[in-house]
Structure formats: C-alpha cells, structure tokens
Amino acid sequence: MTPTATAVETARPMIVGIAGGSGSGKTSLVRALAANLGDTQVSQLSHDAYYRDRSAVPMTVRATLDYDVPEAFDQDLFLAHLAALREGVTIRAPRYCFETHCRLGEGDEVGAKPVVLVDGILLLWDPAVRAAFDLSIFLDVPERMRLERRLARDVGERGRSTASVLRQFDATVRPAHATYVQPTQPLADVVLGNVGRLEPLAEIASALVLDRLARRARARAGAA
C-alpha cells in the first residue's frame, strides 16, 4: 500500500534534494513521490529552471555553450528561493526555454508545502545548496541508460535532433558528469539505483521521506 504524508505535520517545509546525472530519472521520481505523498502535501522545484538567461547571446553561440557546469546556473537566485521556502514563503520560480536557452519570465508559484522536492544534476555540488536539504538522494544509473533516456527526452520533448544530443553528450555532458556530478554521490544521504521499474524506487523514497518527517515530529514533541 502506498504511504501518505497526511498524518505527519511539520513546523516548516522539509526540503528533499534529488540529484543524479542527466537522464537518471530525477524528474520521474519527483512526480512519483508527489503522487505517493499527495499533491496537497508536496511542492516541486527544478534546478533546471535556474539556467542563466542567454537572450543577449547570439543563437549560434548559445548552442555551443556548456550547460552542464555550475556556472551555467543562476545560483544566487536559486539559493534565495530555497531560503525563502525554508522560511515558509511561497516563491515564483523562473521559466526557462530549452529550445532558445532563454528565460521567459516568472513561472508558476511554488508553495512552501510540508514537503518540497527539488531535482537537478548539480544539487550536491554547492555546499550552500546541500545545507538547505533535510534529505538528499542520489540516483545512480549507468551511462548507457542515462544517454538513452536523455535522447528520448530531448528529441521528444525539447525539439532536439538525435545528432545534436549525441554531440552534446560527448562534448559536455559526459565530461561534466565525471567532473561535477559523480563526485557528489558520496555526499548524498542515500544512494538509490534506478535501473528498473520506477514504482518500487518511489516506494522506497516515499518511506525515507516519511521516516524523516516522523523523526522531526518526535524531536519537536520531545522538545516541547
């Protein structure tokens, strides 16, 4: 039976970071967790929304930039929004267009619900971001499977060609994974392999979140 979080109350949002390489299934796990825990209990935020706006850069240059390094992100805004959510303040995350590499203004509101699920490839690289998480999960997936998933996503959802996705993977994604993503795996609270069906993985992750929520509730009760 799928657990629900409705019986567990928290004093402030519990922020859960879900990290891992491109194509590791982070977004899919976030959606499954939200379904398991209940949409009324969960907010979702993607680090991808915080890519820097490249509207001032010629399109021919934008296509050659490296989007898999820490400098590609507006980290100051991301940290400010995480801090606001921790304080119970609703934020409005940016909207980013992957086809044009431009920011499209403000997106939907992200409320400070009992659980805030955050996903991104470089979530654990920045110590300040790591410190914002009450629980961090790293999804460990073999490179071949990550590439297959990235191809399906970028070609099917982001208007990319197969050739361009493969070029980018070889030029920037693979080296950045080795330099910035994989070294953060030991920094996660929990490492989960995501090579099979999503449902069992989501059940495990849901149980981890509920356990942390229950611990916080017990700690508050003991301090009262």
Segments from the language model and where they lie:
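NTP-dependent small-molecule kinase module
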Residues: 2-7, 111-112, 152, 174-224
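P-loop (Walker A) phosphate-binding loop of NTP-binding proteins
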Residues: 21
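Conserved lysine of the Walker
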Residues: 26
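Hydrophobic positions on the alpha1 helix immediately C-terminal to the Walker A/P-loop
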Residues: 29
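Conserved nucleotide-sensing/catalytic segment adjacent to the nucleotide-binding pocket
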Residues: 40-43, 52-100
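Phosphate-binding/switch loop-helix module in NTP-utilizing enzymes
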Residues: 81-116, 123, 210, 216-217
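ATP-dependent NMP and nucleoside kinases share a basic, alpha-helical "lid"
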Residues: 104-156
